[in-house]
């Protein structure tokens, strides 16, 4: 289990309160699909993902990105039990979707990059460390059901 300090909890929660989930989620997922094009295979139903502009303008990418980032909101509410919080999603991604668990870490990195671009002044090294710890812990929780 990952332990978050009071300072880390405050840092994560204070920034999260300012996050536009739709914008940051959509940009994070779009960035993942562009930077790591092999991840596109999990999103065949999204239609045209053949270019950066197609991905950035794809409404399904934005909607799903919001859904993914909302799960981080759930993580922030349950930072003391991330494995329990993500148990069902871990099982889904492992047993049904067969997602390479490395993709969770990659997406976490994309979220950090997008947060840094949107909140550059507030995204101090301490803020980054707290968010990096959270994204790593979520990625770890999502791999919990993998065999």
From Swiss-Prot:
GO molecular function: heme binding; hemoglobin alpha binding; metal ion binding; oxygen binding; oxygen carrier activity
InterPro entries listed in its UniProt record: Globin (IPR000971), Globin-like_sf (IPR009050), Globin/Proto (IPR012292), Hemoglobin_b (IPR002337), Hemoglobin_oxygen_transport (IPR050056)
GO cellular component entries: haptoglobin-hemoglobin complex; hemoglobin complex
GO process terms (BP): cellular oxidant detoxification; hydrogen peroxide catabolic process
Domain Globin: 3-147
Binding site for heme b: 64, 93
Keyword Lyase (UniProt): no
Tissue: Red blood cells.
Pfam families: Globin
Record key words, sorted: Heme, Iron, Metal-binding, Oxygen transport, Transport
Reported function: Hemoglobin epsilon chain is a beta-type chain found in early embryos.
Similarity comment text for this entry: Belongs to the globin family.
Name assigned to this protein: Hemoglobin subunit epsilon-2
Species annotation: Bos taurus (Bovine)
Gene that this polypeptide is encoded by: HBE2
């Amino acid at each position: 289990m990952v332990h978050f300090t009071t300072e880390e909890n405050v840092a994560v929660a204070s920034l999260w309160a300012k996050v536009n989930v739709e914008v940051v989620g959509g940009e994070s997922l779009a960035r993942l699909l562009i930077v790591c094009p092999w991840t596109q295979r999990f999103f065949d139903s999204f239609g045209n993902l053949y270019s950066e502009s197609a991905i950035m303008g794809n409404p399904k990418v934005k909607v799903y990105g919001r859904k993914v980032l909302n799960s981080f909101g759930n993580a922030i509410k349950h930072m003391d039990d991330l494995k329990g919080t993500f148990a069902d999603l871990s099982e889904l991604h492992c047993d049904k979707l067969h997602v390479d668990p490395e993709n969770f870490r990659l997406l976490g990195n994309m979220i950090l990059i997008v947060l840094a671009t949107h909140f550059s002044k507030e995204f101090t090294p301490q803020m980054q460390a707290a968010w990096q710890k959270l994204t790593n812990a979520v990625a770890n929780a999502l791999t919990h059901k993998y065999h």
